[in-house]
């Protein structure tokens, strides 16, 4: 018989750097999860992606056990890394803060494909290009 789900917690945590300190500790403590066990598992699973923000969905069961699924880093994080910028533009229509090539957009779209609601790589690329535009990043050929 399947275990009964009592809670689902969604967090964005730096890869390989989960600690029991806020915001991770309190969110997991409220759900009744073994915080140290989760942080060790998460850090081991994401050690190869250091420096990236990793979204994670934690499913908590009735017996206080848990499973978690890591997702791909958010598109804005990947775009900022590709463009070599720290912060997106506050006025994306007026101030362009960086640029990415179509090849970089395609690479990001391929990375994000499993988490995006897109039927083709072209549709995923359009989503990533839209995110880039809203951040003040130009897409060049």
Curated annotation (Swiss-Prot):
Taxonomic source organism: Lactobacillus delbrueckii subsp. bulgaricus (strain ATCC 11842 / DSM 20081 / BCRC 10696 / JCM 1002 / NBRC 13953 / NCIMB 11778 / NCTC 12712 / WDCM 00102 / Lb 14)
GO cellular component: cytosolic large ribosomal subunit
Known partners and oligomeric status: Part of the ribosomal stalk of the 50S ribosomal subunit. Interacts with L10 and the large rRNA to form the base of the stalk. L10 forms an elongated spine to which L12 dimers bind in a sequential fashion forming a multimeric L10(L12)X complex.
CDD domains from the UniProt entry: Ribosomal_L11
A Pfam family it matches: Ribosomal_L11
Biological process terms in GO annotation: translation
Name of the featured protein: Large ribosomal subunit protein uL11
Gene Ontology molecular function: large ribosomal subunit rRNA binding; structural constituent of ribosome
């Amino acid at each position: 018989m399947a275990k009964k789900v009592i809670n689902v917690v969604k967090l964005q945590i730096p890869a390989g750097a989960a600690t029991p300190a806020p915001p991770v500790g309190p969110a997991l403590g409220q759900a009744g999860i073994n915080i140290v066990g989760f942080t060790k598992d998460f850090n081991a699973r994401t050690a190869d992606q250091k420096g990236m923000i990793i979204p994670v969905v934690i499913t908590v069961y009735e017996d206080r056990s848990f499973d978690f699924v890591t997702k791909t880093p958010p598109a804005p994080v990947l775009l900022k890394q590709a463009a070599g910028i720290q912060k997106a533009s506050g006025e994306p229509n007026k101030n362009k803060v960086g640029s990415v090539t179509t090849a970089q957009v395609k690479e990001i779209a391929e990375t994000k494909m499993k988490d995006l609601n897109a039927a083709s790589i072209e549709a995923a690329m359009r989503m990533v290009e839209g995110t880039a535009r809203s951040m003040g990043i130009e897409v060049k050929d």
